[in-house]
Amino acid sequence: MNHSRSHTLFVQAQTRIPGGVNSPVRAFRSVGGEPFFVARADGPYLFDVDGHRYIDYVGSWGPMIVGHNHPAVREAVQVAISNGLSYGAPCAAEVTMAETIARLVPSCDMVRMVNSGTEATLSAIRLARGATGRNHIVKFEGCYHGHGDSFLVKGGSGMLTLGMPSSPGVPAELSKLTITLTYNDFDAATALFEEMGHHIAAVIVEPVIGNANCIPPRPGYLQHLRTLCTQYAVLLIFDEVMTGFRVALGGAQALYGVTPDLTTFGKIIGGGMPVGAYGGCRDLMQHIAPAGPIYQAGTLSGNPVAMAAGLAMLELIQAPDFYTHLSNAAAALCTGLQQAASQAGIAMTTQQIGGMFGLFFTDQQVETYAQATACNTDRFNRFFHAMLQRGVFFAPSAYEAGFISSAHSPDIIEATLEAARAAFQTIANEAAILSESEAPLKMP
C-alpha cells in the first residue's frame, strides 16, 4: 500500500504535536511503522487520506457499537447542532441521558456527566475518598483508568504498550496511596483487606480488562471483591468505560450479576463524541456539589450535541436481540481467526465477551497481566501489519482489546477471515524460512 499522504502528514504532525499524535498508542510505536491518517469512516470501514479502505475492529476504541456514521446518530447530531453547539447551562437532553442510564444500569440512581473516561474515574475516586474519609485506593495490574496521577501505576493501555511502570511527574507520595494487586488473584485481595481494609477508600477495577487486551474475570472473582468491599466498608468502583453498554446492555455488572457502588462510563454514551459519566446510589451521589461538599465541575459537561448523539445510540442498542447478534458475530470472528492460526501452525488464543475480544499469541488461556505480557508480541506485530496490508485494521498494540459492531455483517467477517488465512500463512512461511536460515550447517 502507498501511504505517501499519511507519511507527509505524520512528518508534519511531529513538528507541532508531541510524537505526532494526540494519544500515544496511535503512533504505532508498539507495532512499528507509521500510522495511517483517517479521512472518513462509515459503517464497518475506515478510509485513509491515501484512498485505502480498512475493515475496522478498533471502533474508536469501543464506542462505535452500531458502526461509524450511523444515519440515526448523524441525524440526531445535525438536529442538535442546528440549535447551538454548547450552552454552559442545563438542557433537557442531560436529564434524558441521566434517566436513560439509570433505567438501563440499576446501580446508578443518580448520574453526573463529565467530558471523558479519565474525568469520570478521577471524579469517582474523589467522591470515594470524600465519602469514606480514607485515602488509599486499590487498582489492578494492567487495568487502565485514564491518565490521572493516581492510576499511572502499572497501568494498562498506552502505559503497557510503552513499557512504562509509571510516569514521570507523578509524585511518589501520591503513588504510595495507590495499591496495585494482581487481577484474578483471590488470595492477594483477601490478604490485603485483612491487613489494611479499614484504610481503603475504594477498589477500582475494569470488570473485564480491556487495556491489557481482553481478560475476563475468573468465576466468582468480582463477587469476591464485592464481598470484601462490603465487609470493610470500602466502595467498589466498576470502570465500565469499555464494558459499559458493550458486553451487555446493562454492562459487565449485569452480565456477571455484581453490583458496584459507583460506575464510570466513557464515550459510548456520547455516540463516540467526547463524553463520560459516573453514577451510583443516591446517598453517595448526593455528596457531589452543589448537593453536597465534594467539588466537581465542567464547562462542557452535558454538552447538548454529545447528549443527542449518545441518546440516539442508546436507543439503537435497545433493539431486540441486538447483543445476541453482536456476540454471535464476535464469536464467529474469534473462532475463524483461531482456526486460521491453527491451520498455519501458529499458536494463538482468542477471548471474547459480547462484542469485545482479544487476540493472544500463545497456546494458553490468559487470566492475568503477567500472562498477557508473556505472549509473543513480535508475532502479533507481524499479524497486525499483514492484516493492515490486506485492508483490516486491528488495534496497533498487542495489549488492546478489539471491538465489533452491528455493521460487521457475515460478509465482512468472512472477508476478514479470508485476509487472516493469507496473513497467517505468510507469517508461517516467514518463520519457516527464518528457522531454516538459523539451522546449523550439516557436515558431510
Curated annotation (Swiss-Prot):
EC class (word): isomerase
GO biological process, one term: protoporphyrinogen IX biosynthetic process
Location relative to the cell: Cytoplasm
Identification of the protein by name: Glutamate-1-semialdehyde 2,1-aminomutase
Family: Belongs to the class-III pyridoxal-phosphate-dependent aminotransferase family. HemL subfamily.
Pfam families documented for this protein: Aminotran_3
Main location per the UniProt record: cytoplasm
Chemical reaction(s) catalysed: (S)-4-amino-5-oxopentanoate = 5-aminolevulinate
Enzyme Commission number(s): 5.4.3.8
UniProt cross-references to SUPFAM superfamilies, sorted A to Z: PLP-dependent transferases (SSF53383)
Annotated positions of the N6-(pyridoxal phosphate)lysine modification: K267
Entry keyword Lipid metabolism: no
Cofactor dependence: pyridoxal 5'-phosphate
GO MF terms, alphabetically ordered: glutamate-1-semialdehyde 2,1-aminomutase activity; pyridoxal phosphate binding; transaminase activity
